[in-house]
Each structure stands twice: as C-alpha cells, then as structure tokens.
Curated annotation (Swiss-Prot):
InterPro entries: aa-tRNA-synth_Ic, Rossmann-like_a/b/a_fold, Trp-tRNA-ligase, Tryptophan-tRNA-ligase_arc. It catalyses: tRNA(Trp) + L-tryptophan + ATP = L-tryptophyl-tRNA(Trp) + AMP + diphosphate + H(+). It is an enzyme of class 6 (ligase). Its EC number is 6.1.1.2. The lineage of its organism: Archaea, Thermoproteota, Thermoprotei, Sulfolobales, Sulfolobaceae. GO terms for molecular function: ATP binding; tryptophan-tRNA ligase activity. CDD domains: TrpRS_core. Pfam families: tRNA-synt_1b. It is found in: Cytoplasm. It comes from the Archaea. This is Tryptophan--tRNA ligase. The gene is trpS.
Length: 381
C-alpha cells in the first residue's frame, strides 16, 4: 500500500504516521524508560511536550544522558531561517530548548541563517534577511533563555570565526551528498551549495556532544554531520525530534507562513486570533448541537484540542477533563475553541511584553553575555 504522507525538510504533506516515520528515517522512539532517566537526571517533572510525546523520536539521546550522568555534559544547538513573521509552530523547538537549558544548565547556540534565506530566494535582499533576523531574535529572546549561557549569532556577522572549520567540513562533503539532502540541483547557486557546511559548524562549537531539538522534518540535514563528525575529531550530533503542531485547517501537513489561514502569528491581535480559531480551526465535532450532544466529538482530529494537548494546557488533569467532556458531548466545539482562544491570547500578550523587553537584551545575547564574549574570541578550526 502506498504511503499517504510525505515528510522532507522542504515539504510536509498528508496525515503523518509518526511510527512509520521513525522506521523510515531510522531514528529511535522516545521510550518511557528514556523519559524516566531524563526525569531522574534533572530531579524534576518532565516538560509537557515530553510527557505527551510531542518530542517523540531521537538519535543518541541515551548517549546525551550517559554523558550528563558521567559529568561530561553536553550543549544545545538550534536555529532559525529568518522570515517576515514567526508563527506559534516556530516557537516549539525554542520553548523546549529553553527548558532543556534550564534543567540541565547547559550552553545554547542559536544560529540565525540570514545568508541561507538570502541565497534560497531570488527575490530577497540581504538587507531584508538581516532586518527579519533582528525581529525574529526578539521573539527568540522572549522565550526566556539564559543570557550568559546563550549565544545568538547571524551567519553574515560570525562567518570569520566559523570559516576555517566550515572549509574543513566542506572538503568532506560531495555535491552529490548535499544535493539529495538539501533539495539542490544544477541550477542552484554556489552559495547555497556551500551553506550546508556552515550549518554543521555549530555542532562542533564544543568538544562535547551536541543535542539538536527540532521538527522531525529537519532530521535529514544532520545525517551529513553524523557521517563526517568523527573523522574531524568531533561527536556525532544527537537529536530529539518533535511532531508538527497541526495547521488550523486540519490534521494534515504543517503550518505555513505563506498560508495565513493555517497559522497563528506571534503578531496576531486578540480579535484576529479569535476570528482565525473560530473560522478555520478544523473541528472534530458533529454537524449539529443535537448530534454532538448525542454522539460527542473526536478530539483526535480536532485542531483546537490538539493545540491544547500539545502546547497550551500543561495541566494533565485539566486536559483529561476537556477530552472527556468533548468525547461525551458535554462540551461543544465552540466552547472548546473558546478555551484555546483564551489560552492563546494570554500567551501572546505575555510574549509581546517579553518581546518588548528583549530589545534591551539583543546585544547581551549576541555580543556581551558571558558565552557570547567567549565565542567572539574564538576561531573555530
């Protein structure tokens, strides 16, 4: 039987079967045993996204825990290709990375790929991608990272420090390998052909194992790193993979910045949030109130419930009650959507306040914090 979904770094289509994807990508499932080990390591409760299998797959997370338990530590790496506006789905890896930093007390490196964004789109100027970088950095800082253990860097600014190591990496990679992984062809400009080498450099910022929290669609990018890392004297990058927060329009695919009806943007005001949720959020309810009261709704396909489950309702008892009431028909679709609207608007209001304060912290994360100052003194070879 043909597979009815597609997951690549540049395209997600259909309703994703995550168990099949683990087999297809050759990753490992986040088992209950592994989660218990993580819980013991931090001596605290796990993040809601771990408890509820939003982060469901990994490569070498067991080795990360081994290193941590032995006192060797690890570091975190994530990044962002800047865009005109970030949506809720873009925040998931950053929120989880911040939690990992807080609980394991480790360094975080956040790469802003203003160069890649410029190279990939013929219509974008470098000034545009640099401007978007600043705006996106404000949203990232607002998540709450430790300013002395986090280094946020733009490729066009930090390139001198990374270039020697990126050249060594580039020499290990053939165009054939890069072409298949990054969706390139003979019409691709030579800048984007070189870029994958630059993306690998931060996985080698420390002589420790690197953990990358990201969407499962990003996994293929790091296979190249894992193929060459040990030959350069570094560890293979470990990853922990998240599922996709479903688009408002239904359980298939993922949110898209180019389709406003699929996403809630961090800049959406309360009325826009309410309008989008009420109009576009795919419902698992029945066609009429009478039928819904009689047969109940299906939270498994209901986007409002899925957003609450994956992100916005961390209280396990509360989410169970919402699920029970919706399945039984005691809670209507409109009531479920209103819960999400209220949660979303509270979250976005707090985010906007933190984002405003982040304007005073940009230079700390990029240049003046403890980790940032140390990184600007280093040339990576």
């Amino acid at each position: 039987m043909a597979q009815d979904f597609t997951v690549t770094p540049w395209e997600v289509k259909g309703k994703v079967d995550y168990d099949k994807l683990i087999v297809q990508f050759g990753t490992q499932k986040m088992t209950s045993e592994l989660k218990e080990r993580a819980k013991r390591a931090i001596n605290d409760e796990l993040h809601v996204m771990l408890r509820r299998d939003v982060f469901f797959s990994h490569r070498d997370f067991d080795l990360i825990l081994n290193d941590y338990e032995k006192g060797n530590g690890f570091f975190l790496y994530t990044g962002r290709a800047p865009s005109l506006g970030m949506h809720i789905g873009h925040l998931i890896p950053f929120i989880f990375t911040k939690w990992l930093q807080e609980k394991f007390k480790v360094n975080v490196y956040i790469e802003i790929t203003d160069d890649e964004k410029f190279l990939r789109n013929v219509d974008y100027t470098l000034d545009q991608t640099k401007e978007w970088s600043y705006e996106n950095i404000l949203d990232i800082i607002a998540v709450g990272f430790d300013p002395n253990k986090t280094f946020i860097f733009q490729d066009t600014e930090y390139i001198k420090n990374m270039y020697p190591l990126s050249v060594k990496i580039a020499k290990k990679l053939t165009f054939n390998e890069v072409r298949a992984t990054f969706g390139l062809d003979t019409s691709s400009n030579i800048g984007i052909i070189f870029y994958p080498a630059l993306q690998i450099v931060p996985t080698m910022f420390e002589k420790r194992r690197c953990l990358i929290p990201a969407g499962i669609d990003q996994d293929p990018y790091w296979r190249l790193q894992r193929d060459i890392a040990e030959s350069l004297g570094y560890f293979k990058a470990a990853q922990i993979h998240s599922k996709f927060l479903p688009p408002l329009t239904g359980p298939e695919g993922k949110m898209s910045s180019s389709q406003p009806e699929t996403a809630i943007y961090l800049t959406d005001d309360p009325k826009t949030v309410e309008r989008k949720i009420m109009k576009y959020a795919f419902s698992g309810g029945q066609a009429t109130v009478e039928l819904h009261r009689k047969y109940g709704g299906n939270p498994d396909i209901d986007v409002a419930f899925q957003w609450l489950y994956m992100f916005f309702e961390p209280d396990d008892q509360r989410i169970r009650k919402i699920e029970e009431d919706y399945r039984s028909g005691a809670m209507l679709t409109g009531e479920l959507k209103q819960i999400l609207v209220d949660k979303l608007n509270a979250f976005l209001e707090e985010h906007r306040e933190k984002r405003e304060k982040a304007k005073d912290l940009v230079n700390v994360f990029k240049f003046d914090g403890d980790l940032a100052r140390d990184m600007w003194k280093r040339i990576h070879v």
